[in-house]
Each structure stands twice: as C-alpha cells, then as structure tokens.
C-alpha cells in the first residue's frame, strides 16, 4: 500500500506513551472500504491460506484476541492492517518500501506462479495481505513480533518490499524487508520519532549489535554474508548505510517519497535545520533526510494527526494554495491524500491500569478533511458506527460519512474548511473529555465492572462522533450545493 508512517518513542511523547501511526492508502484510482473490528481467538484457522500468493502457513494454537482494520468487502484477503492484541502489543503493517536491482537480483522476491503447461502452481511468499494476521495474535512484546515475522520471512519469503512497526509500552521496533528472504529491524530510540514515506528508511545499522547483544538491532541470520557476497555496502568508511545498500534514490522518490519525510521533519523540528531555500540543510528532494530525530518539544496524538493529514501547508507545494507563486503547486505527493483509507494511531499509555493502557485513534478517508477518535482497544466488540462498513454507501457508516465529507469539502474548500476545522476540534475535545472521565471511572471500578465500562465508553464516544459527523456532513453539503453552477441569485417573489 502507498502509506505514510510516524513512530514516537516514549520519552518523545507528551505523557510517556509509545505511539505508532500509519496512513493506509489505496493505490491511484482505487478506494478500499475499511472497518474497525475485534478478531476473537477462535476465528483463526489451524492453517492460514493467502488469497494473493496461495501460500499456506500453519498457525500456533494459542491466538490472542486482537483488534484489526480489515477490508470491508470480502474477496481479496483480510488485510488486517493495524491492531492491538490482548497482551497490549500494537502492530501496523505495512508501509510499502523500495529496493534496488542489486538486492532483488541477489535475493529475488517470492512471487506466486500459477499452474501452466501441466506444471502445478508455485505459491508465493507472505505480504501485506497476511502479515498482521500471521503475527499479532501470537506475540507478547514488540521484540517478539520482530522475531516471529523475521522467522516467517526467512522460511516463506515475501513477494513485496515492506516496513512494519511493533510496539509495547516500553519499546517500538521498525522492521524492513530486504529482497525475498532477508530483513533488518531497529529499535526506535526512546527520545526520538521516526518518519517513513514509501521508501526504505533505516540509515544506520550496527551489525555487531545485531549479531551480539541485540539491544537495538536485529536482522536475518545471514545478513552479514549477504551484504559481503553481493557487494552491497557502498560506504567508503565501513559504516553501513542500509538506505544506500538496500534502498533507492530514484527520480520518483524525489516527487513521491522524500518530500513527505521532509515536510514532517520540517514541521516537528522547524529550528533544528534550515529546511528551505538554496542554503537549506535538507530539501524535499534530499536523499539523506534523517530516519529519526529528537523533537524540539514533546509530541501529542494531535501532532501525529496533523503531519499525517498534511499537504505541504505554508509551502509552494500545497495543492490548495490560493496565493503566491503557484508554479510548484501540487508538485509533490501529499500525505493527506484523497485515497487515504484510514489512519490508525496506537497509543500505549504507561500511567493507567493495564486494561485501559491501549487506545486506538481511528480516522477514515482523506485525512485533510477528517477527524480521528480514540477507543479503548481491550474490548470484545467495537461500535457499529466504525464496524458496519460494507461496499454500500451509507450515512450509518463512519467510513462512508468521512468519504462524503472529504469529497464535498475538497470541492468547496474555501467555504468548507472552517466546518472541517471545527468538526475536528470538537470531536477531539469531546472524545478526550469522555476518555478522561472513563479512565477515572474504570480505574476506581470493581474488576467485574471494568469490561462493560470500556465498551460503554467506546459506545459513548461513537455516539458523540456520529452526531458531530452528521452535522458536518450537513454543513459541507450546504456549502457545495450553494456553489453549484446552476445557482441563481434571484428567488421567487
């Protein structure tokens, strides 16, 4: 998927939480309806079979309950995408990344080959369709998630290049696939954040740690030999830069990928470097943008949502710019794009009881015109407003309401923007108030009451969301209708 990811270490966040967030985007010309659901342990089969690659993977028999963001329309696989399991481990997958011919020639992707000329089919490897479903129900820490996925990659291979984030209350790990069977993972520094467009991102890797103490780096068992035997290390000083060894620096990266990383870093560290002009330290086409940075202040969920909604505001590249030099307007791929399917931000809070530790902030459709809303993840079911998505357009579905608001507000941008801004602030304020109240109620409640209170809280938040979303839909529909080309100023007498 064409996505954007941001990861925030616990000492870089406002309350000590670890936060992982990703926009899940459809490919150009497509929109994928999504839903927010709970997957129970008994729903997992003994053997998983991929729709795309036909690979069959036996599953352990000790699955945990998990939340997920699967496709709402069946037929093309599960695509669980993002979720939290009952052990308070979060995962988001995947960020499609890039590679280069040297890597792909040395370790080709494992692509499904259909039966032909009397020969049986050859299954492919695992991919984005499968990864969350194969890993999240069976792990109890972020590090354990890296190791399980790494083992699956080495055994079954993959047919695509992907980046995957794992999180618990203490750690965040980022794994990137390398060719068909290799991989590397790096622990996000606690005091830093990471931004990831659709490009291999890790820019430094300590092989000695990965093959020694494994404190901050992990990798496939033969990665050192793979690098040596295929002359992949391009450094002059012996310090491996994985971005040079395994990644890409194509012209397409400079309009599709690097500008997104540049804008996020520029927004969160505006004074650390010079970001604009001919003397800039980093520009939108720079290949050496840092993988991680220490922010200039602690980051909030709202900061994460802003950068994942961005479209180069305040730069010459904003597609909605109505002033200044417009020659570069829309030159680069926005983060908040028309084909955002959903955004999920998983927050692991250290200062509350474990049963309310995990909060999932969910948004649907184009982030430039939506709002995110928080829900407790430790539940048996999710609110129908977020779970009832089908292929049929309906105002009873938050996904479809968000799609309609986005399309109408885009077409009436100048008049509708104020309604979208008030909608987002109103939902965030009201849902935070409800979350704060229920945090207190649940913390002081008897154990037998807590599960019901978590679901009651989610229901109350969804009801408030639905009311405000319906009101905003009404407002942007009015603005767009008022600007129709067949409008006429004179009314009947």
Which residues are covered by each model-predicted region?
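Histidine-centered catalytic/metal-binding microenvironments
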Residues: 424-493
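Short, charged, surface-exposed loops that flank catalytic or proteolytic processing sites
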Residues: 138-144
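Short, well-ordered beta-strand elements within core beta-sheets of diverse protein domains
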Residues: 132-138
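A contiguous strand-loop segment
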Residues: 2-128, 148-280
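Substrate-recognition/cap regions that form aromatic- and gly/pro-loop-enriched pockets
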Residues: 313, 317-444
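Glycine-rich, aromatic-lined ligand/substrate-binding cores of catalytic
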Residues: 225-351
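Short Pro/Gly-enriched beta-strand edge/turn motifs at strand-loop
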Residues: 60-65, 146, 322-330
């Amino acid at each position: 998927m064409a996505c954007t990811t941001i990861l925030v270490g616990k000492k870089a966040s406002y309350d000590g939480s670890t936060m992982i967030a990703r926009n899940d985007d459809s490919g150009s010309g497509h929109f994928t309806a999504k839903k927010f659901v709970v997957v129970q342990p008994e729903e997992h089969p003994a053997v998983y079979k991929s729709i795309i690659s036909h690979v069959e993977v036996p599953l352990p028999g000790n699955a945990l309950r998990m939340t997920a963001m699967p496709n709402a329309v069946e037929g093309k696989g599960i695509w669980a995408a993002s979720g939290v399991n009952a052990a308070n481990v979060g995962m988001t997958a995947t960020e499609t990344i890039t590679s280069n011919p040297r890597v792909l020639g040395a370790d080709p992707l494992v692509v499904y080959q259909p039966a032909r000329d009397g020969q049986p089919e050859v299954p492919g490897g695992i991919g984005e369709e499968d990864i969350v479903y194969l890993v999240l129900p069976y792990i109890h820490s972020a590090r354990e998630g890296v190791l399980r996925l790494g083992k699956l990659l080495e055994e079954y291979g993959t047919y695509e290049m992907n980046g995957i984030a794992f999180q618990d209350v203490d750690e965040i790990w980022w794994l990137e696939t390398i060719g068909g069977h290799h991989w590397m993972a790096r622990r996000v520094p606690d005091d830093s954040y990471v931004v990831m467009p659709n490009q291999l991102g890790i820019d430094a890797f300590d092989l000695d740690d990965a093959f020694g103490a494994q404190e901050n780096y992990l990798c496939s068992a033969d990665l050192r030999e793979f690098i040596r035997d295929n002359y992949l290390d391009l450094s002059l000083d012996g310090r491996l830069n994985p971005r040079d060894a395994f990644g890409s620096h194509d012209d397409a990266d400079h309009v599709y990928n690097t500008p997104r990383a540049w804008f996020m870093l520029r927004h969160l560290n505006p004074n650390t470097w010079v970001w604009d002009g001919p003397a800039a330290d980093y520009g939108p086409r720079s290949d050496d943008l840092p993988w991680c940075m220490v922010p200039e202040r602690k980051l909030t969920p709202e900061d994460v949502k802003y950068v994942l909604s961005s479209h180069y505001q305040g730069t010459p590249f904003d597609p909605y710019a109505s002033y200044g030099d417009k020659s570069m307007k829309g030159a680069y791929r926005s983060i908040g794009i028309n084909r955002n399917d959903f955004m999920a931000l998983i927050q692991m809070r250290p200062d509350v009881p474990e049963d309310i530790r995990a909060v999932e902030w969910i948004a649907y459709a184009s982030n430039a015109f939506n709002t995110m809303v928080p829900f407790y993840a430790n539940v048996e079911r999710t609110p129908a407003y977020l779970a009832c998505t089908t292929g049929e357009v309906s105002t009873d579905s938050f996904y479809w309401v968000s799609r309609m608001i986005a399309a109408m507000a885009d077409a009436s941008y100048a008049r509708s923007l104020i309604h979208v801004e008030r909608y987002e602030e109103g939902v965030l304020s009201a849902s935070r108030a409800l979350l704060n109240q229920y945090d207190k109620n649940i913390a002081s409640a008897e154990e037998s009451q807590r599960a019901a209170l978590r679901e009651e809280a989610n229901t109350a938040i969804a009801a408030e969301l639905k009311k405000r979303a319906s009101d905003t839909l009404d407002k942007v529909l009015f603005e767009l209708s008022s600007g129709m080309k067949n409008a006429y100023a004179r009314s009947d007498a």
